[in-house]
Amino acid sequence: MSIMSYNGGAVMAMKGKNCVAIAADRRFGIQAQMVTTDFQKIFPMGDRLYIGLAGLATDVQTVAQRLKFRLNLYELKEGRQIKPYTLMSMVANLLYEKRFGPYYTEPVIAGLDPKTFKPFICSLDLIGCPMVTDDFVVSGTCSEQMYGMCESLWEPNMDPEHLFETISQAMLNAVDRDAVSGMGVIVHVIEKDKITTRTLKARMD
């Protein structure tokens, strides 16, 4: 069994028209054993910027803490909020530093540029190789199922409500086909003037 699927989990981000959405499941388990149903996998990195971490739960928390430390230093030094592209470079550096004994987590970044409000999504592998796309990115144990659902449902230029509906359906249907993720979904829809966070109920088995 892969160490990446030891705790399970799924994270997804999707781009809309002047908005982005990021979603994650809520399960934390040890293989088939369930531990909790409210595990945090999405962390705020700015006013309109989030990172989702799927993989080994200990590394999820470690990477989130180390990233927050680097982010605070950056904001103190620069005196401004970090741009999504810069955060991607910061995460890539953090992961690549540990390439010979990596953090077992595959991050997903979603947010809007603090000045231009341009939507941005990307994913990285466990040694920090980034992939920036214009549609959607996925990470976690049921990535094949998530890719299938996203390919079917995603459309360009979706408004925030349509984007929420699409990412929710894709996420709920994908985690239903995976034994080690699920137990509810949390969705953040990021717009220029507001962030909407919703928690969805899913199958609890």
UniProtKB/Swiss-Prot annotation:
GO terms for cellular component: cytosol; nucleoplasm; proteasome core complex; proteasome core complex, beta-subunit complex. One of its GO terms (molecular function) is endopeptidase activity. Coiled coil: none annotated. The keyword Hydrolase does not apply. It is found in: Cytoplasm; Nucleus. GO terms for biological process: proteasome-mediated ubiquitin-dependent protein catabolic process; protein catabolic process. The keyword Thylakoid does not apply. The modification N6-acetyllysine is found at residue 77. Keywords: Acetylation, Cytoplasm, Nucleus, Proteasome. Pfam families: Proteasome. It comes from the Eukaryota. Detected in liver (at protein level). The modification N-acetylserine is found at residue 2. Transmembrane segments: none annotated. Belongs to the peptidase T1B family. The 26S proteasome consists of a 20S proteasome core and two 19S regulatory subunits. The 20S proteasome core is a barrel-shaped complex made of 28 subunits that are arranged in four stacked rings. The two outer rings are each formed by seven alpha subunits, and the two inner rings are formed by seven beta subunits. The proteolytic activity is exerted by three beta-subunits PSMB5, PSMB6 and PSMB7. Non-catalytic component of the 20S core proteasome complex involved in the proteolytic degradation of most intracellular proteins. This complex plays numerous essential roles within the cell by associating with different regulatory particles. Associated with two 19S regulatory particles, forms the 26S proteasome and thus participates in the ATP-dependent degradation of ubiquitinated proteins. This is Proteasome subunit beta type-3. It comes from Mus musculus (Mouse).
